[in-house]
From Swiss-Prot:
Kinase in keyword set: yes
Matches recorded under PANTHER family: 4-DIPHOSPHOCYTIDYL-2-C-METHYL-D-ERYTHRITOL KINASE, CHLOROPLASTIC
Known role: Catalyzes the phosphorylation of the position 2 hydroxy group of 4-diphosphocytidyl-2C-methyl-D-erythritol.
Name under which the protein is recorded: 4-diphosphocytidyl-2-C-methyl-D-erythritol kinase
Gene: ispE
Length: 292
């Protein structure tokens, strides 16, 4: 229910929407409705889109920046704001600007993270007072990856990705490579060669491991690398520097962990010029965690 607390100032600027990495991703089955059941661990990192919000009193939700290839009406940010309106009956609206830096079709959750940041920021800006579980339920209607960003912690995920258990992960540095190739998620999941029967893992087994970054595999990786040559080449290059390099999500981004920022930066400096790369640090908590 909407909160009776005084409203904050009408504008929220520089609200981060962090990327995620899938440390592993196992496809364990397929439900009758066609959704795949998964197990994965989500790692948040400090590579972020930045969103800016201005409260409106007329109920209008308007995206005021262009996002190439994404019409405003289908943007998860706009849909998240309207889902929050529908769930609460608030009469407030918002103007939303997005500084988009996370690549689309990269497997790092950019659109889902933008939606979660919208839910968290507008929960605060509109004075709604919804709890984190309430926001997570709204987020799930927008996409299976949205709830983990609302949860705001690294997590072991099951089901279609919505059954979340927080996990402690060590402070880490990663190199992420985007091979400038868009990988359609639906195409990967619909491939007849996709492994769909990986045995179920137990969270305690993962949690007890000293090295949590060489656990399991990404079941989507063989499909994506067979279909998209640049993804395969980027992964092969990164494996020269860390044999446990792997793809995140359904691609196209690949990543590897390194012992410190200096080592990660040295690897990044050798990156072939045809790809984009980034040295990132792990996050233990979402920057907007206090908004729910």
């Amino acid at each position: 229910m909407p909160s009776s607390h005084p409203l904050p100032p009408p504008e929220l600027r520089d609200c981060p929407a962090p990327a995620k990495l899938n440390l592993f991703l196992h496809v364990t089955g397929r439900r009758a409705d066609g959704y795949h059941t998964l197990q994965t661990v989500f790692q948040l990192v400090d590579w972020c889109d930045m969103l800016h919000f201005r409260r409106r009193d007329d109920g209008v939700v308007a995206r005021v920046t262009e996002v190439p290839g994404v019409p405003a009406e289908s943007d998860l940010v706009v849909r998240a704001a309207r889902a929050l309106q529908a769930a609460t009956g608030t009469t407030f609206g918002a103007e939303i600007a997005i500084d988009k830096v996370l690549p689309m079709g990269g497997g790092i959750g950019g659109g889902s993270s933008d939606a979660a940041t919208t839910l968290l920021a507008l929960n605060h800006l509109w004075g709604l007072g919804l709890t984190r579980p309430e926001l997570m339920r709204i987020g799930l209607t927008l996409g299976a990856d949205v709830p983990v960003f609302v949860l705001g912690q690294n997590a072991f995920a099951q089901g279609i990705g919505e059954e979340l258990t927080p996990v402690e992960l060590p402070d880490s540095w990663f190199v992420i490579i985007h091979p400038k190739q868009h990988v359609p998620t639906a195409e990967i999941f619909s491939d007849e060669c996709l492994t769909r029967d990986t045995p179920v893992s137990i969270i305690a087994v993962f949690a007890a491991r000293t090295n949590k970054f060489d656990f399991g595999r990404n079941d989507l990786e063989p499909i994506a690398t067979a279909k998209f040559g640049e993804v395969a080449r980027a992964l092969a290059w990164l494996k020269q520097h860390n044999q446990h390099a792997r793809m995140t999500g359904s691609g196209a981004c690949v990543f590897a962990r390194f012992p410190d920022a200096k080592t990660a930066q040295q690897v990044l400096e050798r990156l072939p010029p045809e790809w984009d790369g980034r040295c990132v640090r792990s996050l233990a908590h979402h920057p907007l965690a206090a908004f729910a």
